[in-house]
Amino acid sequence: MAANIIATKAATKMASKKEHQYCLLDSQEKRHGQHPFSFELKPYGQTGGNIIGVQGSLTHVIKMIVFPFMIPFPLQKTHIDDFIGGRVYLFFKELDMQAVSDVNGMQYHFEFKVVPVSSNQVELLPVNNKYKFTYAIPEVQYLTPIFYDLSGPLDFPLDTLSVHVDSLTNHIHLPIQNHNLTKGDRVFISGYKHPQTIESYKNNTIFIKCIPPLLSEKINLYIPKNRIRIPLYFKSLKTSK
């Protein structure tokens, strides 16, 4: 699926006009079957009063800006002190030709300070939220963000699960996966066949009881607390015609 790209006002210089585009990498919109997260930049149509997206890729990128965002605790971490040095680094695989290299030879584009938010999430605050490329990137069609700290790459609990339904009991069976679900967590479920679909439930046990009849025995379950949304802002050069 696609990452959201929102066009903003471009500069008016004729020699080398600058375009600014906002890009939201939403973990629930990642490419199917891709792990770690991988996104294809595709245009969206008009949604209500909001125009989302005007082009299918970024071209002549000269600067990238990131804003604060939240992440769930990685599978390797259980406490805020587990983040070595209180830092997390973000690297984009497709932009590996231009990146910062640390003393251990690992590359990154952004460094973040880790701030605790809850027992399930932390906020990442950019130490320097701008990365300027030495040479313009001709085209960016895919983005694959990779997170790590000084101990190595970080893996996250799944935010989307394909689940199965017991047609006799109308219970959703949770697979044994890294979903990190606990009692009282809020989830969203798709796949109902019901005029007034109920999309949110709290899991009281390892099963989630379904009230309306189901469209099929295969449905999707979304876990908001595990969702990651990376807000990025790109500056590009557009050659005048």
Swiss-Prot record:
Keywords: Late protein, Virion. Signal peptide: none annotated. Transmembrane segments: none annotated. It is found in: Virion. Induction: Expressed in the late phase of the viral replicative cycle. One of its GO terms (cellular component) is virion component. Forms the penton at the fivefold vertices of the icosahedral capsid. Together with the minor capsid proteins (p17, p49, and M1249L), forms a complicated network immediately below the outer capsid shell, stabilizing the whole capsid. Belongs to the asfivirus H240R family. This is Penton protein H240R.
